[in-house]
């Protein structure tokens, strides 16, 4: 037999965000970094807000977060990609290839403070990177774990 059902707890993973760019956007990459806009297929749960330019995702609550991204561009470039938190590079998310490529990705679990602002960037080369339309050009997933 089973005991009485307990009180329903809160779901930490109800704090999430998903957004991508399927528009083939041409991004003017600067050496210091250019945020990638993610205006398409947004599914933003409570606890995360997105900026008007669809480039900054701000978390309301401190915690451990799963963050993953993928970027696909139409022509090989010797460009790099990363996640930034409040404008600073997040260690473990930098993809800096030695040879020109068209695909970039990283996944991390990291601790964020309330109010931290997350962005996806291309950086390290003065170039125009055109996001793919045959595969998602750019994808960002954020999930609060604890």
What role is predicted for each listed range?
Residues 4-146:
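Extracellular jelly-roll beta-sandwich "head" domains, especially the C-terminal globular C1q domain
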């Amino acid at each position: 037999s089973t005991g009485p059902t307990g009180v329903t707890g809160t779901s930490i993973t109800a704090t999430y965000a998903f957004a991508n760019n399927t528009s083939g956007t041409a991004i003017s990459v600067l050496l210091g970094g250019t945020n990638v806009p993610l205006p398409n297929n947004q599914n933003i749960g409570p606890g995360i807000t997105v900026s008007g330019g669809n480039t900054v995702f701000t978390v309301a609550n401190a915690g451990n977060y799963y963050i993953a991204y993928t970027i696909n561009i139409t022509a090989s470039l010797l460009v790099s990609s990363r996640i930034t938190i409040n404008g600073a590079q997040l260690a473990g998310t930098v993809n800096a290839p030695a040879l020109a490529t068209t695909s970039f990705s990283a996944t991390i679990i990291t601790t964020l403070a309330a109010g931290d602002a997350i962005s996806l960037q291309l950086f390290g080369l003065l170039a125009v990177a055109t996001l793919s339309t045959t595969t998602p050009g750019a994808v960002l997933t954020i999930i609060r774990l604890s």
